């Protein structure tokens, strides 16, 4: 029973972290959409609005910039709790989730962060558009990585529940067989 609670708590921590990240990228979607899926010529204000939005993010107070680190710590605690169990399933599912998390972090660090910094220095519309397209593409890639983490964690949780239910059924059957003797 304690193993079940640990598994549930781990999944809750990781999923809460993932859904917080989804919310963050969802708020960016209203600006990113035009650079991925629409014709910019049909939306002449898209570049200026996105530029203003990401410039404001760069100028945000430091406390707001540190909030995502709390989210990462929550996810790290959840993944650490899973990896601490050292079962094959935990190593496979939580290890793959960790790889996806590191991939998302590296995508953010190498694509999003530099592009946001470049926006404030860019003077040509082509430079701005290129940086905004890089941000939008990186956000999409990060969202796919987060979706992979959610899928892995839910699958692992369901498989563990099935295994636990099968163990209980076997124990009940063994107890019933023992009683009937």
PLM regions and their residue ranges:
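Transmembrane alpha-helix entry/boundary detector in multi-pass membrane proteins
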Residues: 41-73, 89-97
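Helix-loop boundary elements of multi-pass alpha-helical membrane proteins
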Residues: 1-15, 76-99
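Extended, helix-rich structural scaffolds rather than catalytic motifs
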Residues: 4-35, 72, 100-104
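Membrane-helix exit/juxtamembrane interface segments
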Residues: 21-46, 91-95, 105-115
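Non-transmembrane, juxtamembrane loop and terminal tail segments
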Residues: 165-181
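Juxtamembrane membrane-interface segments at transmembrane-helix boundaries in membrane proteins
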Residues: 1-3, 46-64, 123-139
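Eukaryotic polytopic
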Residues: 83-160
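Interhelical loop segments of eukaryotic multi-pass membrane proteins
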Residues: 30-51, 98, 117-125, 164-170
């Amino acid at each position: 029973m304690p193993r079940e609670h640990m598994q549930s708590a781990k999944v809750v921590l990781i999923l809460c972290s993932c859904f917080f990240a989804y919310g963050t990228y969802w708020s960016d979607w209203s600006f990113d959409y035009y650079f991925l899926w629409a014709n910019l010529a049909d939306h002449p204000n898209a570049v200026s609005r996105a530029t203003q939005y990401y410039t404001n993010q760069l100028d945000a107070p430091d406390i707001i910039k540190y909030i995502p680190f709390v989210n990462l710590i929550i996810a790290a605690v959840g993944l650490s709790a899973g990896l601490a169990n050292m079962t094959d399933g935990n190593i496979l599912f939580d290890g793959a989730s960790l790889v996806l998390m590191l991939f998302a972090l590296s995508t953010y660090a190498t694509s999003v962060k530099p592009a946001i910094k470049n926006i404030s220095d860019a003077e040509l519309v082509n430079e701005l558009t290129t940086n905004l397209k890089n941000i939008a593409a990186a956000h999409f890639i990060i969202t796919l990585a987060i979706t992979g983490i959610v899928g892995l964690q839910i699958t692992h949780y369901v498989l563990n529940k099935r295994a636990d239910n099968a163990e209980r059924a076997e124990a009940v059957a063994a107890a019933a067989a023992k009683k009937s003797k």
